[in-house]
Regions:
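Structural motif
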Residues: 84-88
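C-terminal helix of von Willebrand factor
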Residues: 184-216
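Charge-dense, low-complexity intrinsically disordered segments
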Residues: 1, 56, 139
């Protein structure tokens, strides 16, 4: 894109709001049914239902969700007139580094704009709080999410952040090793189909095997 293009034209994300407790039972049932139909159409070939084209699944927008929470949390507190909030993040995957807008010169010397991942020699600055975070140690891709959580916790000290990571049996062990779980702990966690992670960016973080869930 030309350098004159807006950064928002280069990189966009939309966080979708599927369900809400502010509706009556009839509308809630309709919301749940439509969500089930979308999920069924995405996972079953030859399904009678089709899904909206813009709902096609891509990567895990976890870091983008953390960015959105800086707006969602104040809006939620104001709308519901609450002071303390429990924020639960449910995900079935990790996120890679968040893309940023960069400028470069093409072979004609024209300045262009594109995207690239945040470099290891970069810093993250919260313009509102003034907090600055060094990203130099983020050679492990999941560490970026921990920095995003740290910024959220410093921005909203009255919010309790709880993470729930759904994982299949194949990746369960490797996921726990990311947080330095021992082999004995992993063996016990497989038996219990869950594990409480103590050294993450969340106030509480739980890994749950998908085989332990009631799946229809």
């Amino acid at each position: 894109l030309p350098a004159s293009s807006a950064a928002s034209d280069v990189y966009k994300r939309q966080l979708l709001h599927f369900l809400t407790s502010s509706v009556n039972k009839k509308d809630m049932d309709a919301q749940l049914l439509n969500l089930w139909r979308c999920a069924y159409a995405l996972t079953k070939r030859g399904a009678r239902y089709d899904y909206p084209e813009k709902y096609w699944l891509g990567g895990t927008p976890l870091n983008e969700t953390f960015v959105s929470l800086h707006q969602i949390i104040p809006q939620f507190k104001k709308r519901n007139n609450v002071q303390k909030v429990q924020c639960v993040v449910l995900t079935d995957g990790e996120a890679s580094g968040i893309p940023v807008v960069t400028e470069f010169k093409n072979h004609d010397g024209e300045v262009r704009r594109g995207t690239s991942n945040v470099g290891y020699n970069s810093f993250l600055r919260n313009r509102k709080t003034g907090h600055v975070y060094n990203l130099s140690g983020h050679y492990e891709y999941w560490k970026f999410a921990e920095t995003m959580l740290r910024d959220l916790k410093e921005s909203f000290p009255d919010v309790n952040f709880i993470g729930i990571r759904i994982t299949d049996r194949r990746e369960f062990g490797s996921f726990l090793r990311m947080f330095h779980a021992t082999e004995d702990e992993i063996k016990k966690a497989r038996k219990n189909a869950s594990f409480s992670i103590k050294n993450s960016g969340y106030d509480s973080y739980f890994a749950i095997l998908d085989s332990s869930l009631a799946v229809d």
